[in-house]
């Protein structure tokens, strides 16, 4: 009787091990299948690169208010803190579109990538001096470091701001691409001057940073939304892009009707700023994407 019991117990244990093994194999197969499915869906989706800046606000609203979803197209935002990270993905084809600036697009085109620019955004850039360094004017930037991004609006604007200005020494343009890191360097007294757009520019003003130059002073409109020409010409992408534009324009209408303050929570979520910053933001108007 005892031997029979041991035999039954051993058999039950072996069956349990066998079932566990099968279960593990099944789980591995299912995980692999799910991963491959996710990859296929991601490749098929329209992927748009965005930054934690207010020129991307219509995209954030279209995402969180389900305007993209309502179109029936799979439209996905890919958030990054750096223009260069978006550019790399755009050039490599893992993004179909992105919010960027005209100078970056010119650089990308020189790399041999076809680009279709569909809109100019309301982005502007302001140059701030470190209040700890007591920098109040552009002419004080001699022998100082200015944080910017190479071959971008901020690189171009550095030259514009310094044109005809006599400084006591060379101005050192240093590359810091992460917009959040750039702001932290100001707050931590690690950079003499730097370019910021909204809402980081408002955060800098609240910190007491001195604005040295505003891109709007020269009438520049450098913000842009663009798609890869290859994606633009692709028949399978046409509906997705049309749906993206429709959702974007709906978000623009809502912002212009109600003001950006209505979307404070969304701004905080995507841009990482606090309620004080949201309340101090300037009034901004947005334009439709109008493709000719």
Segment roles from a protein language model:
Residues 121-131, 206-237, 241-245, 283-288:
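Periplasmic-binding protein-like
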Residues 3-10:
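Sec-dependent signal peptide recognition
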Residues 132-139, 163, 169-171, 183, ...:
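Proline/Glycine/Serine-rich low-complexity intrinsically disordered segments
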Residues 64, 91, 110, 163-167, ...:
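Sec-exported extracytoplasmic/periplasmic mature domains
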Residues 16-19:
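C-terminal motif of bacterial Sec signal peptides marking the signal peptidase cleavage site
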Residues 234-292:
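Secondary-structure end/capping motifs
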Residues 23-176, 185, 192-198, 211-219:
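Short, glycine-/small- and polar/acidic-enriched structural segments
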